[in-house]
């Protein structure tokens, strides 16, 4: 059975839907997985993030978390959001990664960035570069 990867649309007033459409239509995604959109295209004011587009982005993140909990999807790819407007819509996490960790009740998680030739798992996220050295150790 193929793993199912969900894609959120991000902030639909910005580049989120374009990024997802480009990825899904590129022909470069592995055929060993199935891909599903989380949420639906909303009729929002385009051009700059706004409270309405942030509210929809937050709703789609909640839908993705529920789909993960229920086993409907196995992983999620999140499109870009504007954190400032997302926080204005009631999103209280530093980023989407921490949101999913809390919703899925896990302390063992990582943000990964994947490209054509390289996948990177980040050791730290959403902190200042100045703080990074004090947070790294060989035990973890």
Where are these regions (language model features)?
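Ligand-binding beta-strand-loop-alpha-helix segment within the catalytic cores
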Residues: 113-140
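Short, well-ordered coil/turn elements that cap or connect secondary structure elements
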Residues: 30-32, 106, 115
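A glycine-rich helix N-cap at a beta->alpha junction
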Residues: 97-107
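Proline-centered loop/turn at the N-terminus of a beta-strand
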Residues: 34, 108-110, 119
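Short secondary-structure boundary/capping segments
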Residues: 27, 112-113
């Amino acid at each position: 059975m193929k793993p199912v990867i969900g894609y959120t649309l991000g902030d639909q007033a910005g580049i989120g839907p374009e990024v997802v459409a480009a990825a899904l239509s590129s022909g470069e995604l592995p055929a060993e997985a199935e891909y599903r959109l989380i949420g639906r295209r909303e009729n929002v004011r385009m051009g700059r993030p706004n409270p309405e587009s942030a509210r929809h982005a937050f709703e789609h993140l909640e839908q993705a978390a529920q789909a993960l909990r229920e086993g409907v999807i196995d992983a999620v790819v999140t499109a870009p959001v504007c954190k400032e407007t997302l926080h204005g819509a009631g999103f209280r996490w530093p980023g989407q990664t921490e949101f999913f960790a809390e919703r899925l009740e896990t302390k063992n998680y990582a943000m990964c960035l994947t490209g054509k030739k390289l996948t990177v798992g980040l050791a730290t996220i959403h902190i200042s570069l100045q703080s990074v050295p004090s947070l790294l150790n060989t035990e973890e």
